[in-house]
């Protein structure tokens, strides 16, 4: 609808958004990543919790993330209903940008840094809402249902729909249980998968492939699992290949692909079959999103 209006008028109707500050305190433990942070936030606030808001992410755990981790968090703000998400610029931002192809040249660099510093939120800024998340006890998070807010820690029991007080949540959980074939009290550990997919705009960056390759080194994909690695851009693909990461994936049994959206939205032949389960680094697990309506997606 908005595309139609823009083409017809050259304008878009937009309202001023509220700003919600999300402070992620503490530090992430081993095996816990930026994706786990944003899945936890969506679990706590809901898939509609950010409607009418922009999310500002801060706190110790966010400051400790590298730039690509911050990008992963901001990327999924929309999955929580927010119009946008951002992290205030700091030295991590500037180090990431400096020397890149489209970054300001050395003669203009200091001028741009001064400008970026000027648009940071003030130390005494007032927000429409402030939410706190504790990263110290955060575990790897996975979705158990059919939207990005139906999330649990990987070793945490899946919630019982009948124990939910909210009628809307209860109905949504019942639908998810039927689709995902769950039983109350089970965990996602041991939930068999048929397909493993690493890539997309959420987790298709160089740092993602470096970390996955580190874990894969010396291991092999099960013969019954179809595994794909799809870099998020051609730049990422060439960087991975320059470091030899593609060979690690191939030797482990992954298909190494050119950049693209691939299984995120069942592009071309990269489609989930009926009854298949996919472990996916993407951002959406809606019914039919990745292929057959009877396929099941687990985000992680």
Feature roles, as predicted:
Residues 1-300:
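Fe-S-dependent hydro-lyases/dehydratases of central metabolism
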């Amino acid at each position: 609808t908005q595309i139609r209006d823009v083409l017809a008028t050259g304008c878009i109707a937009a309202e001023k958004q509220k700003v919600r500050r999300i402070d992620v305190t503490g530090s992430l433990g081993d095996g816990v990543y930026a994706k786990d942070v944003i899945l936890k936030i969506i679990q706590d606030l809901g898939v509609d919790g950010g409607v009418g808001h922009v999310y500002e992410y801060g706190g110790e755990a966010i400051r400790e993330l590298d730039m690509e981790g911050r990008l992963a968090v901001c990327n999924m703000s929309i999955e929580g209903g927010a119009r946008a998400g951002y992290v205030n610029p700091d030295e991590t931002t500037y180090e990431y940008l400096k020397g890149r192809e489209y970054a300001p040249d050395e003669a203009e660099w200091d001028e741009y840094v001064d400008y970026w510093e000027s648009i940071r939120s003030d130390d005494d800024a007032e927000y429409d809402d402030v939410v706190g998340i504790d990263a110290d006890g955060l575990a790897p998070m996975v979705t158990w249902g059919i939207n990005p807010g139906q999330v649990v820690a990987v070793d945490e029991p899946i919630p019982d729909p009948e124990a939910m007080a909210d009628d809307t949540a209860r109905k949504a959980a019942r639908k998810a249980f039927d689709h995902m074939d769950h039983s109350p009290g089970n965990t996602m550990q041991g939930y068999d998968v048929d397909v493993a997919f690493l890539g997309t705009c959420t987790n298709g960056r160089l740092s993602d492939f470096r970390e996955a390759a580190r874990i894969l080194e010396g291991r092999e994909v099960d013969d019954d699992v179809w595994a794909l690695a799809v870099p998020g851009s051609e730049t990422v693909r060439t960087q991975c290949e320059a470091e030899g990461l593609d060979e690690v994936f191939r030797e482990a049994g992954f298909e190494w692909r050119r950049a693209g959206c691939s299984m995120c939205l069942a592009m071309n032949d990269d489609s989930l079959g009926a009854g298949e389960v996919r472990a996916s680094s993407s951002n959406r697990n809606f019914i039919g999103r990745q292929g057959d309506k009877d396929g099941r997606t687990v985000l992680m």
